[in-house]
Structure formats: structure tokens, C-alpha cells
A protein has these predicted regions:
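A helix-centric hydrophobic-segment signal that preferentially recognizes long
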Residues: 2-165
Length: 165
């Protein structure tokens, strides 16, 4: 009789363990998929920022090169050189301002659109992580999670110190 009861309990716990493991794997896959979806706009944002910085340098350099050539060509006469140096100073300021006004605005507006995509992906990712973390922290599923080496994952935008809670 006791053997039958023990066998029945082991079967129930075994079934629970298998179903819990499947649920944990499903939640883990959902989390990985959400992270993969979020990685696309995050990478695009980095690329846009790199382009913005490269474009800024290119704009500055082209205007500065022309003004520098004028300085080199007018080294002999002080008045001409000072005039060329002034053009160089203005070229640097104008190039920097042009970047801020045109290229940077366009790139920043594209980055703002990416930020919206990132915010949506962040919500999906954080929801998946919260579901997985809730299961990992619950009893008795937490026991199975510990044995199967599932761990609590950080939310996007959360510091590592906040995971202790």
C-alpha cells in the first residue's frame, strides 16, 4: 500500500517536474526571441550614431581642408595670412554648425524612430523576462529551475544591484 502511494506521489512530482521544465524552456525561448528582436534596432541605433559621428568628421574636414589650403597659399603676407586664418576659423565653426543643423538633425530623427522601436521591443523583452523570473523564483518550480540551471535574468534598463530584490 505504501509502495503504491509512494509510486503515485513520485509519478505526480515527476510529471510536475517535466511540465515545469517545459514551461521554463518555453519562457527562456520567448526571452531569447524578444532579445533578438530588440537587438536589431539597438544595432541600427549604434550604426546611425557611428554614421553621424563619421559624417560630422567628414564635414568638418572638408571645410577645414579648403581653408587650410588658403592659409598655406597666403603665408608670405601677414594680412593675407590673417585673412586666411580667419576663414579657417569660420570654416571650422560653419562646418560644425552645419552638422548640427542638417545632418545631425536628420540622423537624430532616425535615431528617435529607432528609440520608439526599442521601447516596444523593451516592453516585450521585459514581459518575457518577468514571466521567466517569476517562474524561477516560485516554489516549487524554483527547485527545478535551480537543478536545471535556470537563472534570474536582468530587465532591460535595470541595474545589476536591483536583481537582488
Amino acid at each position: 500500500m505504501w509502495a503504491l502511494a509512494l509510486l503515485l506521489m513520485m509519478t505526480l512530482f515527476g510529471g510536475y517536474g517535466v511540465s515545469t521544465h517545459k514551461k521554463l524552456k518555453e519562457l527562456q525561448k520567448r526571452t531569447e526571441k524578444a532579445y533578438g528582436m530588440m537587438a536589431v534596432p539597438l544595432d541600427a541605433r549604434l550604426e546611425r550614431i557611428d554614421r553621424m559621428l563619421a559624417g560630422e568628421e567628414q564635414t568638418l574636414l572638408s571645410g577645414i581642408r579648403e581653408a587650410r589650403r588658403a592659409v598655406e597659399a597666403n603665408r608670405e603676407k601677414r594680412e593675407d595670412r590673417l585673412c586666411a586664418e580667419t576663414r579657417l576659423t569660420l570654416a571650422i565653426a560653419a562646418a560644425a554648425q552645419a552638422v548640427v543643423d542638417e545632418e545631425e538633425r536628420a540622423i537624430l530623427s532616425r535615431i528617435a524612430l529607432l528609440e520608439q522601436d526599442i521601447a516596444l521591443c523593451k516592453e516585450d523583452y521585459n514581459a518575457a523576462v518577468q514571466a521567466l523570473n517569476g517562474k524561477v523564483r516560485s516554489f516549487p518550480a524554483g527547485l527545478i529551475a535551480a537543478v536545471r540551471k535556470f537563472s534570474v535574468l536582468p530587465l532591460f534598463g535595470e541595474s545589476k544591484g536591483a536583481l537582488a530584490h
